[in-house]
């Protein structure tokens, strides 16, 4: 079954499968299924075309998903960088934005270590 350009896994429960769509988390998935009148524990393979269509309609109406959600997130980050605020500077420098320490850790954000040569030890004569 395909929703918002994403192939949902047929063997998973509907509530879990919907979270494979970018922009839909567990709570949103539960709300969508409740509005469509579908039990969350039903598998995607068990849904008929009518139920699938109801899910698609609800998502199209009320949710920003996939490309639209990613685009909005990128626009928000770009705006922060353009206005030159602290958060924007942290994004620009690829450093943690939310106040985490950086002297140690922050490897995910900073990337692989760039080794800096230390002082050579003088040998005794």
Swiss-Prot record:
<comment type="subunit">
    <text>Part of the 30S ribosomal subunit. Forms a loose heterodimer with protein S19. Forms two bridges to the 50S subunit in the 70S ribosome.</text>
</comment>
<dbReference type="GO" id="GO:0015935">
    <property type="term" value="C:small ribosomal subunit"/>
</dbReference>
<dbReference type="InterPro" id="IPR027437">
    <property type="entry name" value="Rbsml_uS13_C"/>
</dbReference>
<keyword id="KW-0687">Ribonucleoprotein</keyword>
<dbReference type="GO" id="GO:0006412">
    <property type="term" value="P:translation"/>
</dbReference>
<keyword id="KW-0699">rRNA-binding</keyword>
<dbReference type="GO" id="GO:0019843">
    <property type="term" value="F:rRNA binding"/>
</dbReference>
<keyword id="KW-0694">RNA-binding</keyword>
<dbReference type="InterPro" id="IPR010979">
    <property type="entry name" value="Ribosomal_uS13-like_H2TH"/>
</dbReference>
<dbReference type="InterPro" id="IPR019980">
    <property type="entry name" value="Ribosomal_uS13_bac-type"/>
</dbReference>
<comment type="function">
    <text>Located at the top of the head of the 30S subunit, it contacts several helices of the 16S rRNA. In the 70S ribosome it contacts the 23S rRNA (bridge B1a) and protein L5 of the 50S subunit (bridge B1b), connecting the 2 subunits; these bridges are implicated in subunit movement. Contacts the tRNAs in the A and P-sites.</text>
</comment>
<dbReference type="Pfam" id="PF00416">
    <property type="entry name" value="Ribosomal_S13"/>
</dbReference>
<comment type="similarity">
    <text>Belongs to the universal ribosomal protein uS13 family.</text>
</comment>
<dbReference type="InterPro" id="IPR001892">
    <property type="entry name" value="Ribosomal_uS13"/>
</dbReference>
<keyword id="KW-0820">tRNA-binding</keyword>
<dbReference type="InterPro" id="IPR018269">
    <property type="entry name" value="Ribosomal_uS13_CS"/>
</dbReference>
<dbReference type="GO" id="GO:0005829">
    <property type="term" value="C:cytosol"/>
</dbReference>
<protein>
    <recommendedName>
        <fullName>Small ribosomal subunit protein uS13</fullName>
    </recommendedName>
</protein>
<feature type="compositionally biased region" description="Basic residues">
    <location>
        <begin position="107"/>
        <end position="125"/>
    </location>
</feature>
<dbReference type="GO" id="GO:0003735">
    <property type="term" value="F:structural constituent of ribosome"/>
</dbReference>
<dbReference type="GO" id="GO:0000049">
    <property type="term" value="F:tRNA binding"/>
</dbReference>
<feature type="region of interest" description="Disordered">
    <location>
        <begin position="92"/>
        <end position="125"/>
    </location>
</feature>
<keyword id="KW-0689">Ribosomal protein</keyword>
